[in-house]
Amino acid sequence: MGFSETQEELVLRSWQSMKKDSESIALKFFLRIFEIAPAAKQMFSFLRDSGDDVPLESHPKACESATQLRKTGDVKVREATLRRLGATHVKAGVADAHFEVVKTALLDTIKDAVPEMWSPEMKGAWEEAYDQLAAAIKEEMKKAA
């Protein structure tokens, strides 16, 4: 299934609403990942030895993924970015199951951030955007392995 104009509009509209609070939302996103899969913290080089206190809000890498869409204004990702993401994910030991954890955390975070906008259609749009990005990263991971 492709990413339709309607789905892109839903993602961009919700992102417009969320971007004013993107740092806080990024923090909630990462904390949700660690709530679902506590061991995931070890996959982030800047968090490996941080103990229980995770100062994500002051670390630029923590917000990078959440703000990428805002910077580009588009859901498409450049080839160079995909190659870098693929190599980074291989180096970190990311597996298919990790992508599902991130997807769940992402959807939960967005639902909490824009409850007045949340709908089955919006959920589907974010799922499609995420699934396409995850598939592209996985493809680059195969090349980098």
From Swiss-Prot:
The record marks 123 as: Homodimerization. The lineage of its organism: Eukaryota, Viridiplantae, Streptophyta, Embryophyta, Tracheophyta. Residues 2-142 form the Globin domain. The gene is NSHB5. It catalyses: Fe(III)-heme b-[protein] + nitric oxide + H2O = Fe(II)-heme b-[protein] + nitrite + 2 H(+). GO terms for cellular component: cytoplasm; nucleus. A motif (Homodimerization) lies at residues 35-39, 96-108. One of its GO terms (molecular function) is oxidoreductase activity. It comes from Oryza sativa subsp. indica (Rice). The keyword Metal-binding applies. This is Anaerobic nitrite reductase NSHB5. PROSITE patterns: GLOBIN. Belongs to the plant globin family.
